[in-house]
Swiss-Prot record:
The gene is rluD. Residues 16-93 form the S4 RNA-binding domain. One of its GO terms (cellular component) is cytoplasm. It is found in: Cytoplasm. It catalyses: uridine(1911/1915/1917) in 23S rRNA = pseudouridine(1911/1915/1917) in 23S rRNA. Responsible for synthesis of pseudouridine from uracil at positions 1911, 1915 and 1917 in 23S ribosomal RNA. Keywords: Cytoplasm, Isomerase, RNA-binding, rRNA processing. The active site is at residue 142. It comes from Blochmanniella floridana. Belongs to the pseudouridine synthase RluA family. GO terms for molecular function: 23S rRNA pseudouridine(1911/1915/1917) synthase activity; RNA binding. This is Ribosomal large subunit pseudouridine synthase D. It is an enzyme of class 5 (isomerase).
């Protein structure tokens, strides 16, 4: 068991989020790891368990972290460089753009200590952890979402990219295959999101959440499914998956959010199609376009990544019926 000394909130820390303050007090641990501890009742504030990462701390409060096992910890210095192939789309002295494969976590965390994008980056760029705790990673894609990611290779590029994302100056477009057909060719989902009250690894639409805006347009329609192009104004965790499920068009293969849509309009499907959909083992989501000003040269940059083979095969089968 790892013992972490109790901490007292100082005057200048009062009013900040619990997860933020802990990430500053414990820089050797990632923020996602700290959130994991909070959500799993490992953090105690003034003798009361706190399960809200967004809880605002107050001057003088005592923060304790209890019962942390060695298996629950992944420190930055423990991340192992691994010779893992990366599909590099673009690279210069300041940035790197990759086309992430499916079944690949971006950053090590609970249950995923190896085989991540960061493990691969450390192998190619051993000093990249000096840029930040996130090792130059300024955006994330879900484990099973494929497509474009930009990574900073210098501190200046990292800071400028973070600023661009915060100011929403980065264009991110996605291709998705969803259940159902739409009544209009384009639309917007403007619904706030927050962590689910009961299912703590889920996100949900809720009026107390943070602003989340998703634009979509129909690219292609099939008998009981659609291919849509999605543009994000905000970048909340699982935003596309949650918003599309909210409007009753969940992503094909999304085991987490599609609910009962595994049998959506099953009468319209052949056995071959139905079996293929049931076996499609990831959300059909691909980050296809990334556009921004280069963080150092300020030149307009744009990258496109073609659809991966599994989604192309899915589209081919959908076209047959």
């Amino acid at each position: 068991m790892v013992i972490i000394k109790p901490m007292i909130v100082q005057v200048h820390q009062s009013g900040y989020r619990l997860d933020y303050i802990l990430s500053k007090l414990l820089p050797q641990y990632s923020r996602s790891q700290i959130k994991h501890w909070i959500l799993n009742k490992k953090v105690v504030v003034n003798n009361q368990v706190s399960t809200l990462p967004r809880k605002k701390v107050v001057y003088g409060e005592l923060i304790e972290i209890k019962y942390i096992n060695n298996n629950d910890i992944c420190k930055s210095e423990d991340i192992v460089p691994q010779n893992i192939p990366l599909n590099i789309i673009y690279e210069d002295n300041d940035i790197l753009v990759i086309n992430k494969a499916s079944n690949m976590v971006v950053h090590p965390g609970i249950g995923h200590y190896q085989g991540t994008v960061l493990n691969a980056l450390l192998y190619r760029y051993p000093s990249i952890l000096k840029i930040s705790k996130q090792a130059g990673i300024v955006q994330r894609l879900d484990k099973d979402t494929t497509g474009l990611m930009i990574i900073a290779k210098t501190v200046s590029a990292y800071d400028n990219l973070l600023r661009s994302f915060k100011l929403r100056k980065v264009v991110k477009e996605y291709d998705a295959i969803v259940y159902g057909k739409f009544t209009s060719n384009a639309g917007v989902v403007n619904q706030p999101m927050r962590r689910h009250f009961a299912k703590r690894t889920f996100m949900s639409v809720h009026y107390t959440g943070k602003s989340a805006v998703t634009y979509y347009s129909v690219v292609e329609e099939f008998k009981a499914h659609s291919r849509v192009r999605i543009n994000l104004k905000t970048g909340r965790t699982h935003q596309i998956r949650v918003h599309m499920a909210y409007i009753n068009h969940p992503l094909v293969g999304d085991q987490k959010y599609k609910g009962n849509f595994s049998v959506f309009d099953i009468k319209k499907m052949s056995d071959e199609l139905n079996n293929y959909l049931l076996d499609f083992n990831r959300q059909a989501l691909h980050a296809c376009t990334l556009q921004l000003l280069h963080p150092i040269t300020q030149v307009q940059m744009k990258w496109n990544a073609p659809l991966p083979q599994d989604i192309l095969q899915l589209i081919a089968i959908l076209k047959k019926y």
